[in-house]
Amino acid sequence: MKQFILSCVLSVAAIAPSQAQQTTRQLPVYLDQTKPVEQRIDDAISRMTLAEKIRIIHAQSKFSSAGIPRLGFPDFWTDDGPHGVRPDVLWDEWEQAGQTNDSCVAFPALTCLAASWNPQMSRIYGEALGEEALYRGKDMILGPGVNIYRTPLNGRNFEYMGEDPFLASIMVVPYIQGLQSKGVSACVKHYCLNNDEEYRHQVNVIVSDRALHEIYLPAFKAAVEKGKTWGIMGAYNLYKNEHNCHNQWTLNKILKGDWKYDGVVVSDWGGAHDLEQSVKNGLDMEFGTWTDGLTMGATNAYDNYYLSMPYMKAIQAGKFTQKELDDKVRRVLRLFYRTTMNPNRPHGFLCSESHYAAARQIAEEGIVLLQNRNNVLPINTQKVKRVLVVGENAIKMMTVGGGSSSLKVQREISPLDGLKTRLGKDGIEVDYARGYVGDVTGNYNGVTTGQNLEDKRSEAKLIAEAVEKAKTADYVIMFGGLNKSDFQDCEGHDRKHYELPYHQDKLIEALAKANRNFVYVNISGNAVAMPWKAKVAGIVQGWFIGSESGEALASILTGDANPSGKLPFTWVNSLKETGAHALNTYPGTWRQKGGASTKGNIIDEEYKEDIYVGYRWTDKERIKPTFAFGHGLSYTQFSISNLRSDKMQMKQDGTITFTVNVKNTGKRAGAETVQLYIHDVEASVDRPQKELKGFQKVHLQPGESKDISITISKEALSFYDEASSSWKAEAGKFEALVGNAADNLKLKKAFELF
């Protein structure tokens, strides 16, 4: 009997592989995971009808596009980032869907991530965000943003990675890799030249090819060539009089031609304006168009999108062939195979403790200690008995607002609560005074903070209360700055002024006079004017840092964590210290009278400062800013010494490695960022005095030292040559400048390229 059973088992075992092989052979190629993806795409395209091709290249709801049910391709779902997964909205409109499971962890804004100067933080950020997106059923996160910080008035700077193209290029790549390692597509935005918000739909940017390639494109190029991003979002603005969501130069020539990009180009919501340009100039997926019938309460208006029925009818009428359509479909199917049709996507997690820990770690590494006179920080918790906290930003929830990056969170710890919890452990009394009243609404697009911030007291009474309490406190910590309301750090508008709103300057001066241990914490994604800087003991740049805001800030202020952030932009004294404002090119010149109220009017904005953005401009004009690019202090001290190189002459196809010794000479563990800049001593064209071309963050215990090496190739020495439309590295003399900030480069090493 046992022998009979064994024979049966062996017979079945022998048959099973044959049946499995037969089943595999019977699978259509587009479903056969053993086949190359491009072959599967070819097979899928051959099976699709014209209508099926059209249906996958435009939206079917606010944030989704249709799949191909007949062939087993599911719908594709996007959602806003880049700091967390946006709460779900209604199918056709922007109102909240009213779900109870669409909260998220709010991660620090990307200015804070960039300020960490730590690519490892970018990887952690991307992975955690990808896991949250997976749990929420999202296939693409609309981010990260890498538009360059050209003016501190840009309302959306907080979503970007600063002024320097090299820093942004290094920081964006691990974010993309981390996110896409979870099977969720990045959608790097806003490509390109979307450097201010106020007239973003009407701005036609006039910029030299050199500035375009040296300043505004490198981070996008890195996202494509090194990050291998699967998605790129076009920008609202125009370049060479064509909107960037369907622009023959930026999309067809540069992105898909020069960079060989194989992913999809997604329109920004409402960024498509023309059928023929949408077909021929590189747009692959159209989302959010509010023209052609999509108005409040309308349904099924997606058929009116340019890449929907108008496109299909034009093909049927012979106006277009299916050549362009098949390229769009190929790219979308490639995206499907990377995401929705990827059987190896992991499981997602939502609001896990590991994600909160990641958010806190990123925040702590990105917070910047700007000024620390007389070592006023960290707070000595063994000697202090009473701390006064001042300012609306100490209690205001900052995850709500700011535009499309607004989030709904399960938890957000305010700075006041964070300090109460931390200082309470040492028996320290924490008092609070409002100081000023700003935006008390606490809601955005149907998501509310649940806070009641109404306060009818006069400015004089608010300041008087704060000053009176400050006189008897051991420390005064004010949380001020901006918020995410219109005309501050918010999408759709730019700031009206460089100065702090709500008369905060007056409050700061009064508090600094009342208490010598006064620390100002600036909560913003932008620089602000600081006319009172010399009167203030401590200044901290606190950013918008999300769910763990209070915990992270309390850790930095008390010394539980040692600040190591560095500024990702130059903190100027006034707007006139930036090229865009010094040359009066912002926000541009209207072509017709009537400005934005004139239908079809365009505003031309010429980037006359050319390549001289940020520290490149202040160097050129010999301006000493409030705080330099790359500036950031620590509670310990470091020495950077013994700069040497592995050679004195570098070949065109070679590399050169620079090495320095970094030592923690203080009494606390901490981290320092070694920054390498290159100076072209003799060039045939005008070049900046220096440009960042390498950096490395190193964590050291007290007394510990390490050698840090940075290797560069001729790419770091090149400029964009407009005559040949190519990058050029000229033979000659160069200098490597090394230090810990753009204004603190004490080491120099000469070398030659031949």
Q: Where are these predicted regions, by residue range?
A:
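Glycoside hydrolase catalytic-domain context in secreted enzymes
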Residues: 17-719, 726-742
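Short beta-strand elements
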Residues: 744-754
